[in-house]
């Protein structure tokens, strides 16, 4: 009987740390920012905007990205692991996944949409209205650029809602139809035109720290590429 009491006492004693730590475990770690945290601070919002650029492909990278010389007559790839080499030797099918950027570009589109819909709510006093408006146009241009890449690679694509989607939506609620090629091109051109007509987007940047950011010259270049693609006989 005494042993049973001792076991019960020991069991109850072992449970104390579990209940004592319950409140501690419920706390959110300091290094895990919420979306509201990001869009209540100028530096965090700027970092988020910079992260949207990360989905832009490096079209000069020879191994895994967009350089097509290796599967054309202009050259050949000797790297066995290269997807271009695998295509040349016929080692591919519809499920190979070579050159597949579908998910990458839609991640960029979603990130840009989140930024566009939330940046106006950033009331950090160090973030001026002019800078906020410029960033918003920058994100809009990035979103249109990712749509351009998708259209160039896949033809008619899914044009996502311009509002932020709830991540808890069911699979059925996330089934959006593909738009026609003409509608896709018109949407991208319209997005580029809105950025070009906006006084908030600079023609170019003077500050060295801003070099590499999208300006109106960048947007005009991508608009021209979109129009050339749409005019190509391959799409008519």
Region roles according to the model:
Residues 21-67:
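Membrane-proximal, proline-rich intrinsically disordered regions
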Residues 156, 165, 182, 209-221:
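Aromatic-lined, polymer-binding surfaces characteristic
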Residues 151-152, 158, 229-235:
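Short coil/turn linking the two alpha-helices of tandem helical-hairpin repeats
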Residues 1-30:
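Bacterial Sec-dependent N-terminal signal peptides
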Residues 162-168:
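Short, conserved phosphate-binding/catalytic loop or strand-edge motifs used
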Residues 41-58, 80-154, 173-186, 190-211:
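Conserved, well-structured interaction surfaces
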């Amino acid at each position: 009987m005494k042993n049973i009491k001792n076991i019960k006492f020991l069991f109850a004693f072992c449970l104390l740390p579990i209940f004592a730590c319950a409140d501690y475990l419920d706390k959110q770690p300091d290094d895990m920012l919420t979306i509201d945290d990001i869009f209540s601070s100028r530096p965090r919002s700027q970092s988020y905007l910079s992260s949207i650029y990360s989905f832009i492909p490096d079209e000069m990278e020879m191994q895994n990205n967009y350089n097509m010389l290796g599967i054309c007559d202009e050259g050949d790839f000797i790297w066995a692991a290269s997807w271009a080499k695998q295509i040349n030797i016929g080692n591919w099918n519809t499920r190979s996944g070579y050159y597949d950027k579908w998910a990458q570009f839609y991640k960029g589109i979603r990130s840009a949409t989140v930024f566009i819909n939330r940046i106006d709510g950033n009331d950090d006093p160090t973030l001026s209205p002019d800078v906020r408006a410029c960033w918003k146009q920058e994100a809009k241009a990035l979103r249109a650029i990712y749509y351009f890449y998708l259209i160039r690679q896949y033809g008619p694509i899914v044009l996502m809602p311009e509002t932020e989607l709830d991540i808890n939506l069911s699979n059925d609620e996330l089934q959006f139809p593909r738009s026609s090629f003409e509608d896709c091109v018109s949407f991208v051109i319209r997005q580029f035109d809105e950025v070009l007509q906006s006084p908030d987007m600079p023609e170019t940047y003077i500050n060295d720290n801003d070099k590499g950011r999208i300006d109106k010259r960048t947007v005009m270049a991508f608009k021209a590429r979109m129009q050339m693609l749409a005019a190509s006989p391959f799409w008519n």
